[in-house]
Amino acid sequence: MSQIKENPALVAAQEAQRKINQALDAGYSFRLEAGAGAGKTYSLVAALKRLIDERGSTLVQSGKKVACITYTEVARNEIAQEIEDHPAILVDTIHGFCWAFIRQFQKAIRDLVIELKDKKEKVEQSGGIGSQLVEYDLGFFSVDEMRITLNHDDIPELMAMLLAKEKFRMLFSQQFPVIFIDEYQDTHRQFMDAITDYFLKSKTGPIIGLFGDHWQTIYSSEYELAEYPIEEIAKGSNFRSVPAVVNVLNALRPELPQVVSLPEAKGEARFFHTNSYNGPRTNTAHSKEDLPSDIARSCREELMARLRVEGWDLKKTKVLMLSHNVLAVEQGYPKIVELFRGRTEQFTKKEDPVIRFFAEVIEPMCMAYSSSHYGDMFKILGARPAITKHEDKMLWRRDMDRLLKLRIEGTIGQVIDHLKITKRPSLPDRILRREEELISLMGIPEVEMSSRSQRYKKLREIPYKEVIEVTRFIEKLTPFATQHSVKGAEFDNVLVILGGGWNHYNWPQLLELLETKKLTKTNMKGFYRARNLFYVSISRPMTRLAVLATQSLSDTALLTVSNLFGSENVEELSFGT
């Protein structure tokens, strides 16, 4: 009778779960550090199920709950489904959770609003704080005599401000004896600082369980591990990838070694570079020593054709690109990229208020209207308008049909002008202020305008169709992706393109610093930012990984590559003369 082989990843996972259970039983806080493919969510759900089994009835009877705070709505839904929406557990996003708690304390919130960053002038212009209702709707800050509407980012900040007061800490601790925070490394910094300062350091209040991986911090500006005075539990499993890929991850991150489920599983991890290219390379502020965009594209296409011949199924292959200027031309928003050159986060992370409003409100609203999902449309708007007669409905239809037409045929400015007239929906204050500023500058030569006003004027002139395409990209509706858009995802095969075009990531420098370890105050933040994104990218494949570097690499950088991938898996691509 053949012996059943032990699953090393499962053994490591069980040991981590035992330590989580031990911490919960002893009543102390902990941090689960779960690398890529380790099954972080599985550990979190298992801990919740154990709490339900052992304390569920008692919690429900006492009116208390275990809070599970997630980073995304998708994670919230997944976890809630796994625990069958048990009444002893409150699963919600950081914004949903914080708002549900603080909305009970209207007077306290009103007193704190004036202390919020950049809000004092707005409040004073609107006549100050009285007895208005404080609400949180579309996520754009506004004040009038009836209500105060909070911004998206105000919610966790206000929560942190309330937790600074002992009265609210006591109420919070009474309601939530245990709090799990999913993706702790990406959770709002002020909220996490409040949790650390008022609960973890003092060892009072709720049991706090942090679940995440500080090497996968790619959304926030914090890239190093924050100081959490609690026990670390390392989960050294990788249920996703074959040994060939995990060996690269372990070489990159020896302090959290992972073991695989199937030690005999076949796969590959290879690195291709372009040092043999002798033609001119890029030399701009944001792209150094890279292949020209047309050469980079043909290089990628030829490599993919070769990989297909070698057995890759391209239907099961994800291309992760960082050369955003190349990607933009292929996806259909080159003018937006040109406008925000060097500041791509303005559209990729929706930091620009115009892009954010279009991507989060206008585009989803138009999609819902086009599909006749009117309930969804009004949900996006935040309220159902007063439609009391047939004429009201006809006016709505007329304005929406005109908006749909302008999306395809008009410019961004024409869409904004249409919304200024119809107020369906109303434009956020930040956009209205930019409009007023531009009107006040009429007749003034563009060279005399501020750079912000010049950029806004040029943004208005861009065809709105580019907004549709950039929104599709942001929402990952394309065959390509940048590394930011795939955190948490997995694919059979992955081709990672490391190139220039995004000033926050210097791949040749990253590879050099991994070897020399010469970190300074100047390069440290960039190093961690690039390292984390590189780790997230190369840890996505289940079976096959290929990395293509289109920038020239130094001998030091190539030494790092050989140490990570093995010299036998590193290849210099040849270019015809």
What is each residue range found by the language model?
Residues 1-577:
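The feature marks helicase ATPase cores and/or their adjacent C-terminal helical subdomains
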